[in-house]
């Protein structure tokens, strides 16, 4: 008997989604999967007033949490930062009694405006992507979540339609069964 795929909450945070070809292409397969809930934070909270109980309920209902966003100033867009600070609160996700996310999985899916070669100690950004994403990895650890290797689409706006379609297929395949032995 085949087991059901893990329930995935895909938190999408892009303040200019209509202008992001790469992120729209990446989202397309996710919208067609029954085990994936796509939650567009900027569509739900244009005023930045986050419904914390609703967001925490969504987190409880899913086993895999995906944070898909562009890299903005070596971090995430402002609304996602606000979401992280407010929703992953002490007593819910961390600290005494904060075990609601323990054992769940965190995966960051990032698009960048620069090539991979720009993310080295001796290059433009002076740090590798693993260092840039360390705060997210630490947040996952704070929540006692499993950190899955990030998916990074470098120089997203310069990817060809074929390259983006290939990334989207691979992403969709992973989302369809994210906890399979080859998916982690």
UniProtKB/Swiss-Prot annotation:
Which Pfam families does its entry note? Answer: Flavodoxin_2
Is Ion transport among this UniProt entry's keywords?
A: no
Task: Extract the signal peptide range.
Answer: none
- Write the record's keywords in alphabetical order, separated by commas: Cell inner membrane, Cell membrane, Membrane, NAD, Oxidoreductase
Indicate the transmembrane segments per the record. Answer: none
Lipid bilayer topology: Peripheral membrane protein
GO CC, any one term: potassium:proton antiporter complex
Membership in a protein family: Belongs to the NAD(P)H dehydrogenase (quinone) family. KefG subfamily.
Give the protein's function: Regulatory subunit of a potassium efflux system that confers protection against electrophiles. Required for full activity of KefB.
| Name of this protein | Glutathione-regulated potassium-efflux system ancillary protein KefG
Q: Which source organism does the UniProt entry give?
A: Escherichia coli (strain K12)
Q: What is the lineage of its organism?
A: Bacteria, Pseudomonadati, Pseudomonadota, Gammaproteobacteria, Enterobacterales
């Amino acid at each position: 008997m085949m087991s059901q795929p893990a329930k995935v909450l895909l938190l999408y945070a892009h303040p200019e989604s209509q202008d992001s070809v790469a992120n729209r292409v990446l989202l397309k397969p996710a919208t067609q999967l029954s085990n994936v809930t796509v939650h567009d934070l900027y569509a739900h909270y244009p005023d930045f007033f986050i419904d914390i109980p609703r967001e925490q309920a969504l987190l409880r209902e899913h086993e895999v949490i995906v944070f898909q966003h562009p890299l903005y100033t070596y971090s995430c867009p402002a609304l996602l930062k606000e979401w992280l600070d407010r929703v992953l609160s002490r007593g819910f996700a961390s600290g005494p009694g904060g075990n609601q996310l323990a054992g769940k999985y965190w995966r960051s899916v990032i698009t960048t405006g620069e090539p991979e070669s720009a993310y080295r100690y001796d290059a433009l950004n002076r740090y590798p992507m693993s260092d840039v994403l360390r705060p997210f990895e630490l947040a996952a650890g704070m929540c006692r979540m499993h950190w899955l290797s990030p998916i990074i689409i470098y120089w997203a706006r310069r990817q060809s339609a074929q390259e983006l379609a290939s990334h989207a297929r691979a992403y969709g395949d992973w989302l369809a069964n994210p906890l399979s032995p080859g998916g982690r």
